Amino acid sequence: MRTLFQTIKQQFLEENDLVLASITASSGSTPRGAGSRMLVGKHGRITGTIGGGAVEYRAELMALDILEKKESDEHEFRLNRKDVENIGMICGGDVTVFFQYLDHNDPIVMEIAETAEKSYEERKDFWLICDLHATSGMSLYSPCYGLIGNADVPSSILSSLSAQPFR
């Protein structure tokens, strides 16, 4: 994840828009699980992976389309013989990928990337929170720095995050 935030920051400084492709749900046999992320720019995948192979290739093409449309979207890949898209995978599972459009002019995303980097340097816990609805907001929550971003996050969620035993 550290590389992801460093790359977002660098790409934004170069005035490049991005798409963050994240697996939000998976079931059955799939190459990668929920939480896997890949960052895509105008020339394709920059960093991260959502499993490689046909799913990642198709997701990369969809991300390039998202860059042109400048709107976030979601897509479900069905990995079986009866797959309507027939991407050639028969793992037997399903993968849902959320494509979050990141505008390089958005100061909130830059602040999130900078705060994440600072949190890594100081070895502080934080959570990236992505709104998977039409607004596709993004926030970062850290007990040290508070809530940064534009995702609508109830305070009850924030207080429960601080008590979680994971990073």
Per-region residue spans from a language model:
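Segments forming oxygen-rich coordination pockets for charged ligands
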Residues: 1-167
